[in-house]
């Protein structure tokens, strides 16, 4: 009995520690969002002396928003940049979209590369290789096809690239769109994701997604260039790690990386979350423990049990109150990331929040069950450490 009592006491202490850690993350991310995101910062260098930037744009297929998203890059207000559009297949409809924009903006330094270069299993790296090899500026901006920008987005990112910074990244968020699936995505990228993303970066953990990353080409070349990351599916994580390992700091842009895909659904969102969870589990095995207990419902149960064991509080009353507080703080976080009025009602938020939180265990168990992922046109079997092998159809 003494051993059991000691174990229960240890679990109760763990629940208390979990409570303080998770609420520290809540407060930290909200304060950072209010102080840093969507703020106009003073220019750290004259406009005319901003460094040149080579934009690498990987393209695969089209969606209803692709041409509008791409056009925002042709309309950037920046003194010196080039756009390197990379398409894998000649018959890809994205080729026609690119040619249309190249004809519409002849004064913009932009080129189209078709065919890619096979250097590994990562299709995004393979697609970008021709553009990377001819990039002429010291800064490389890799930005996904579903991202849209403002005219001053690149200026904001370049101003964050100070002397000791090697990588500038944008917090992923989602543009206002119609439909419940869009609301669900917006709630996730405005609550759970920024809480972990911001907390990790502020406390010194390198957490970067590759949707919009500005990097020093010299540092990437020292790490072996893009080809060195072609063995990984999550190339963004390993690029960031390589830059950090060489002593460079990271900085987060004040503007978010605004996702604006024209194709979205609840099933697509769920599949994307499962794919990301699989990658995290294989790259960082500690995720198996940390991720489930950081979600609202599981954390509330653990902390509620600890409160009952130590203080004899009612578990269900504590669970409901804790979830309500989490729900409210998530809404505050969402409004901060949005930087303005939301495109949906508080009722829509409540429903989307509950469904998103209810999905978490299913997403996590699905990720554990099957180590293979489908991404772009291929299927891959993940290995521990982040590498992968392509599954070829026989």
From Swiss-Prot:
EC class (word): transferase
Keyword Kinase in annotation: no
Domain of life: Eukaryota
Motif stretch ((Q/R)XXRW): 272-276
Record: active site: 236 (proton acceptor)
Annotated compartments: Golgi apparatus membrane
Catalysed reaction, written as an equation: an N-acylsphing-4-enine + UDP-alpha-D-glucose = a beta-D-glucosyl-(1<->1')-N-acylsphing-4-enine + UDP + H(+); UDP-alpha-D-xylose + an N-acylsphing-4-enine = a beta-D-xylosyl-(1<->1')-N-acylsphing-4-enine + UDP + H(+); N-(9Z-octadecenoyl)-sphing-4-enine + UDP-alpha-D-xylose = beta-D-xylosyl-(1<->1')-N-(9Z-octadecenoyl)-sphing-4-enine + UDP + H(+)
Membrane topology value: Multi-pass membrane protein
Principal localisation: Golgi
Pathway: Lipid metabolism; sphingolipid metabolism
Segments carrying motif D2: 144
GO cellular component terms, semicolon-separated: Golgi apparatus; Golgi membrane
Keyword terms, alphabetized: Developmental protein, Glycosyltransferase, Golgi apparatus, Lipid biosynthesis, Lipid metabolism, Membrane, Sphingolipid metabolism, Transferase, Transmembrane, Transmembrane helix
Residue intervals on the Cytoplasmic side: 33-195, 305-309, 370-394
Lumenal side: 1-10, 216-287, 329-348
Short sequence motif named D3, residue ranges: 236
Pfam families: Glyco_transf_21
Transmembrane portions of the chain: 11-32, 196-215, 288-304, 310-328, 349-369
Biological processes annotated in GO: glycosphingolipid catabolic process
InterPro entries, per database record: Ceramide_glucosylTrfase, Nucleotide-diphossugar_trans
Molecular functions (GO terms): ceramide glucosyltransferase activity
Family in the record: Belongs to the glycosyltransferase 2 family.
Purpose: Participates in the initial step of the glucosylceramide-based glycosphingolipid/GSL synthetic pathway at the cytosolic surface of the Golgi. Catalyzes the transfer of glucose from UDP-glucose to ceramide to produce glucosylceramide/GlcCer (such as beta-D-glucosyl-(1<->1')-N-acylsphing-4-enine). Glucosylceramide is the core component of glycosphingolipids/GSLs, amphipathic molecules consisting of a ceramide lipid moiety embedded in the outer leaflet of the membrane, linked to one of hundreds of different externally oriented oligosaccharide structures.
PANTHER family reported for this sequence: CERAMIDE GLUCOSYLTRANSFERASE
Domain notes from UniProt: The D1, D2, D3, (Q/R)XXRW motif is a critical part of the GCS active site, involved in catalysis and UDP-sugar binding.
Protein name: Ceramide glucosyltransferase
Species of the source: Xenopus tropicalis
Biological classification of the source: Eukaryota, Metazoa, Chordata, Craniata, Vertebrata
Gene transcribed to yield this protein: ugcg
């Amino acid at each position: 009995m003494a051993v059991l009592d000691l174990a229960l006491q240890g679990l109760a202490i763990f629940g208390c520690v979990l409570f303080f850690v998770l609420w520290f993350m809540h407060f930290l991310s909200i304060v950072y969002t209010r102080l840093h995101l969507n703020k106009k910062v003073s220019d750290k260098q004259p406009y005319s002396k901003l460094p040149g930037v080579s934009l690498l744009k990987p393209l695969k297929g089209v969606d209803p928003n692709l041409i509008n998203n791409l056009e925002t890059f042709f309309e950037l207000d920046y003194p010196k940049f080039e756009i390197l559009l990379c398409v894998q297949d000649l018959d890809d409809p994205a080729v026609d979209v690119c040619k249309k924009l190249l004809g519409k903006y002849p004064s913009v330094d932009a080129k189209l590369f078709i065919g890619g270069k096979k250097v590994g299993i990562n299709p995004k790296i393979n697609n970008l290789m021709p553009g990377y090899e001819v990039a002429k500026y010291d800064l490389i901006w890799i930005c996904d096809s579903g991202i849209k920008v403002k005219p001053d987005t690149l200026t904001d990112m370049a101003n964050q690239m100070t002397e000791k910074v090697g990588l500038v990244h944008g917090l992923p968020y989602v543009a206002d769109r119609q439909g419940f699936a869009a609301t669900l995505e917006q709630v996730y990228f405005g609550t759970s994701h920024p809480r972990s993303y911001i907390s990790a970066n502020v406390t010194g953990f390198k957490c970067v997604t590759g949707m919009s990353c500005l990097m020093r080409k010299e540092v990437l070349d020292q790490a072996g260039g893009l080809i060195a990351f072609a063995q990984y599916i999550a190339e963004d994580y390993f690029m960031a790690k390589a830059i950090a390992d060489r002593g460079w700091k990271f900085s987060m842009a004040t503007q978010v990386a605004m996702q604006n895909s024209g194709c979205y659904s609840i099933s697509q969102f769920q599949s994307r979350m499962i794919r990301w969870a699989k990658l995290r589990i294989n790259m960082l095995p500690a995720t198996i423990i940390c991720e489930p207990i950081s979600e609202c419902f599981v954390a509330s149960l653990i902390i509620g049990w600890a409160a009952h064991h130590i203080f004899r509080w009612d578990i269900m009353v504590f669970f409901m109150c804790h979830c309500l507080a989490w729900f409210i703080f998530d809404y505050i976080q969402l409004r901060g990331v949005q930087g303005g009025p939301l495109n949906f009602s508080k009722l829509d938020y409540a429903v989307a929040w509950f469904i998103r939180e209810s999905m978490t265990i299913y997403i996590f168990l699905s990720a554990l069950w099957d180590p293979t992922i489908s991404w772009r046109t291929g299927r891959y079997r993940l290995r521990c450490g982040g590498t992968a092998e392509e599954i070829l159809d026989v």
